[in-house]
Amino acid sequence: MKEYRTITKIAGPLVFVEKTEPIGYQELVNIVLSDGTIKRGQVLDTSDDLVVVQIFETTTGIGRDSGVRFTGETIKMPVGREMLGRILSGGGKPIDGGPEIVPEKRLDITGAAINPWARNSPSDFIQTGISTIDGTNTLVRGQKLPIFSGAGLPHNNVALQIARQAKVPGSTESFAVVFAAMGITKEEANYFMQDFERTGALEHAVVFLNLADDPAVERIITPRLALTTAEYLAFELGMHVLVILTDMTNYCEALRQIGAAREEVPGRRGYPGYMYTDLACIYERAGIIKGQKGSVTQIPILTMPGDDITHPIPDLTGYITEGQIVVNRELHRKGIYPPINVLPSLSRLMNLGIGKGHTREDHKKVSDQMYAGYAEGNDLRGLVAIVGKDALSERDRGLLEFADLFEDKFVRQGYDEDRTIEDTLDLGWDLLSTLPVEQLTRIDRDLINKYHPKLKAGAKKE
């Protein structure tokens, strides 16, 4: 262990130390104060004669005469089966009043990118119990599908509902949820803990909570701790793991804060130029590995500043991930929960996990027809505001009514309502039955005869 007393500068969470020997990147550091207190940090940058250390807590009490000890080790996450059912801080320490976790292994939190050749193509449907996701923007095991939200919208409720209800229908394989919250208030943290305990979802979950008043540096390691835990459960214990990360905007703000303290040249809107690479290091840790039983599926959640989908955070996230679920303020104002707008939403891997052998043979066609009907009906609302409803044709009035029914019956559902994929598709058929059969141009005739409620009822009478 190397020790120096050569602190030259302290800026925010960063401590600058002169050194004479080589120091490794991301090496753990112990800073000993004059009263014997030890503060922990990590090497953020190293050059020929200077090391930048980021402190995992406040820099209060650190002086030029404080001892700086370089341990020669990187951050490792203690992992084990005992983690299931536990609530941990953003730094990986138990905060639920339970005993310390006895680790089976200690793993480097940086992880490693999955070799593209070793990746298996995602193909298994994950049922979230939310119709707007399962029916029209299906989540597939091994996918990374973000939720784009805005300040004040109920994305945390959606996250908790997914964490509680997510499952692979008909599968007997072990399923777990790793939930990591970053930059949340104490009120939100209490709400998360109470909801997990009330619903019993905590039994198969590991929860990490980083509070808003915790150091920004801790916010940087929280998602990495969560993903290291998920990779252990998936690839060493053979479990299928869903990782929910909220709120990635707070994570990116922490990146910007640390970048400013390091006096880096800023990129777009003040965010570091390497933010794309940094986010990719997190998102790309999802997937399925050939020959391995487990999988890691990711749902990162972020709030778009000013509801701007072109902001660097959602913009870069969209480049890396495989689609997006968009939470809409207008639907929220109408009192609709979950306020998910299916029109700008997209799941790029949806077609790999639906259809015969996965969900149901009519899934793709029903989804396409509902999307087309809702899109046209939604466009007609703008026309009605100009010319009035009476000026519409009978066909247009039917589509306008379909758009209202779609929001009220399909999009709207209860916080504790867990719909099966059969419930979702049957509900879709009920809505489509309000339109004339000849307008269902995106559905094959044999599927209409088999699933259309009115035609099914007629066939039974005969």
Curated annotation (Swiss-Prot):
One of its GO terms (molecular function) is ATP binding. PANTHER family: V-TYPE PROTON ATPASE SUBUNIT B. Keywords: ATP synthesis, Cell membrane, Hydrogen ion transport, Ion transport, Membrane, Transport. GO terms for biological process: proton motive force-driven plasma membrane ATP synthesis. Component of the A-type ATP synthase that produces ATP from ADP in the presence of a proton gradient across the membrane. The B chain is a regulatory subunit. PROSITE patterns: ATPASE_ALPHA_BETA (PS00152). It is a peripheral membrane protein. It is found in: Cell membrane. This is A-type ATP synthase subunit B. It holds the Pfam family ATP-synt_ab. Has multiple subunits with at least A(3), B(3), C, D, E, F, H, I and proteolipid K(x). GO terms for cellular component: plasma membrane; proton-transporting two-sector ATPase complex, catalytic domain. Belongs to the ATPase alpha/beta chains family.
